C-alpha cells in the first residue's frame, strides 16, 4: 500500500461548463422546502469507476463526461445559473447560463492502491474534490463543482459538490442519470426534468397542523462541550453493519416489534442510544434524531411529477429525554424512530413548508443532542453508468457535523451498511465502546470494520 502523504494529483485549468445550446434566461423561485436555512450548504459525493476497455475502449472519461455534462445542462439549465435572494431572503435562481465548475485531474495511483480510502469518510476528498477559493458559497456561486480524476489503472473518480437547496439525493440522481445517458449516446434524458417548485410552496394562508420537533427550540442542559469543539477536535469514523451486527441487534428487540421495523430503523435506534451515551448528555436534555423521509412515491401520498428534482423530503424527529433513552432497552429507541417516521405524509410536508414561512426559516438545532440521519443505501448512485459500468463505490463522501448518511458497502464477503459519524474525538472513543457494548458479539467484526480520519 502506497503512502498517501505523497499522493500527487495534478489539476488542469478550472473550467466553466455551460449548456451545449442556448437556454431560457429567466428567474425561477425555489420552493419553501428548498430554501430553508437548514439546506443552505453543499454536499460532497464521490463515484469511483474501474477501467473497462470492453465497454469503452480508448475513450477518455474526462472528454466524455465534460460533453455529456454540457448536453445535460440544456435540460437542467437552472443548475447552470446562480442563486440570489429576494425579499425576506427568499431564494431564486437566476438562469443566466454561466455554467458549473469543472476540473480535469490525474493521479499517480490505482483504484486498487486506494483501497478503502475511497469510502466515507474519504480522507483524500480534498485531493479528488479541490475546494477552489470562492466556490463553496451559496449566493452568487456556481451550483455544482465537478472534478474528474483519471487514475494510472485506467479507472477514474468523479467527485462533485452540489448546492443542497437545488436538489435532494433523488433529484441529484436524476441529473447524474441524464449525464450518464448522454455519455452513452442518448439524445435526451429518459426522464425529462420538471421544475414546478410551486408544488411545494406554502399554503395560503399558511398553517402549522403537525408537531415538528426538528424545528423546536429546546433548553440546552449540556455543558457546551459539543458546541465548543472546534473542527480540529472533530473526527469522523465509519461503522459497518453487516449480517452479524444486525442479527445481534435484532435479538434485543421483542418479536412483535422487530417484525415491523426496517434495517434503517434498527441502526438509527442503535446510533441514537450510543451517541447519547458517548456525548454524556445531561439526563434532562431533550434528544432528537431526525430521519430524512422521501416524500416521493405512493407511500406518503405526495403527488409530484416523475422528473421533479427539487427537495421533496421532511425530517420528522424521534424525541426523548436523554435519561430514558439511555436507561431503557434498545426497543425504546426503536419505537421512537418508527413513531417519528410514521408521521410523514403530505399533510406533514405541507405543514413543514408553512412553518418555514411563518417562522422565518428556522435552522435545525446545532446542539450535540440533535442528529439527522439519511438513508442513501437505495438512492441509486451505484447504478450511474457513464459507459464504464457501475461504480465500485458511489455516494456521499463523508458525514457533515450533525448529519450522517448511510451508504451501501460490500466488504468483499457480504453487502452491509456503512455509517459515517462525526463527533469530538473523546466522544468518538466512547461511541465506539458503547457500540461494541450494545453488539457484544462478535466484537472483532465491528472493530475490523472501523475507519477513522480527523477532519
Curated annotation (Swiss-Prot):
Its EC number is 2.3.1.-. Keywords: Transferase. One of its GO terms (biological process) is fruit ripening, climacteric. Expressed at very low levels in the skin of ripe fruit. The active site is at 164 (proton acceptor), 385 (proton acceptor). GO terms for molecular function: acyltransferase activity. The keyword Transferase applies. Involved in the biosynthesis of volatile esters which confer ripe apple fruit flavor. Alcohol acyl transferase that can use a wide range of alcohols as substrate to produce esters. Belongs to the plant acyltransferase family. The fruit of cv. Royal Gala exhibits a high ester accumulation, whereas the cv. Granny Smith contains low ester levels; this influences strongly the ripe apple fruit aroma. This is Alcohol acyl transferase 1 allele GSb. It comes from Malus domestica.
